[in-house]
Amino acid sequence: MAGHSKWANTRHRKAAQDAKRGKIFTKIIRELVTAAKLGGGDPDANPRLRAAVDKALSNNMTRDTLNRAIARGVGGDDDANMETIIYEGYGPGGTAIMIECLSDNRNRTVAEVRHAFSKCGGNLGTDGSVAYLFSKKGVITFEKGDEDTIMEAALEAGAEDVVTYDDGAIDVYTAWEEMGKVRDALEAAGLKADSAEVSMIPSTKADMDAETAPKLMRLIDMLEDCDDVQEVYHNGEISDEIAATL
């Protein structure tokens, strides 16, 4: 779980767990279908679809698979009747948590999310209870690279911020709608990112200790096990030392 970014440990841990469970492609395909249904099949004209395509490619989905998913959405596939639902709540240690879901049955989804919170010492909150603590951003990640070169190209392309971490990794932050454009500009400059995704970035953090960290991880595990849950975002900060024990 040792991530290069102060928020990355959860991102990377989630990707590894979803891949192990064989769920990540199912969730990405669902998002591709829904995004294409709602905004059309052209990623250049549909920021939500472009973000889903970038996520699919970052997770090594083939072009053939993602193109079929887009075609299903444009063609009105049943999966495209899903709606996006955002739940908010509080986890162990006072962590703020946002859960992004795609569902065709709100009652089923909220019951599963509420059950996870009740089992793990958290509370499902009301709309707006924690959303103000997060900002929706595009995050383009380079596991390594020349900081000055990436920063110059990123800022010229319209990025909002560039952050370098102790291990040399670099995160480029963008307005979420501009992530695809910035990534394309970076690639045109010969800078190929390791991943690109839309994320909810917390403005403050809640430090987890040896007691609260495992409880938070259990809650995240339970939420991610819900088929309707697409993403789980939180502001918990876990040190490398504690993370190594989890």
Swiss-Prot record:
Alphabetized GO MF terms: DNA binding
UniProt-listed InterPro entries: Integrase-like_N, TACO1_YebC-like_2nd/3rd_dom, TACO1_YebC_N, Transcrip_reg_TACO1-like, Transcrip_reg_TACO1-like_dom3, YebC-like
Coiled coil segments of this chain: none
An annotated GO cellular component: cytosol
Protein name: Probable transcriptional regulatory protein YebC
Localization terms from the record: Cytoplasm
Region (Disordered): 1-20
Pfam families in alphabetical order: TACO1_YebC_N (PF20772), Transcrip_reg (PF01709)
Key words of the record: Cytoplasm, DNA-binding, Transcription, Transcription regulation
One BP term from GO: regulation of DNA-templated transcription
Record family assignment: Belongs to the TACO1 family.
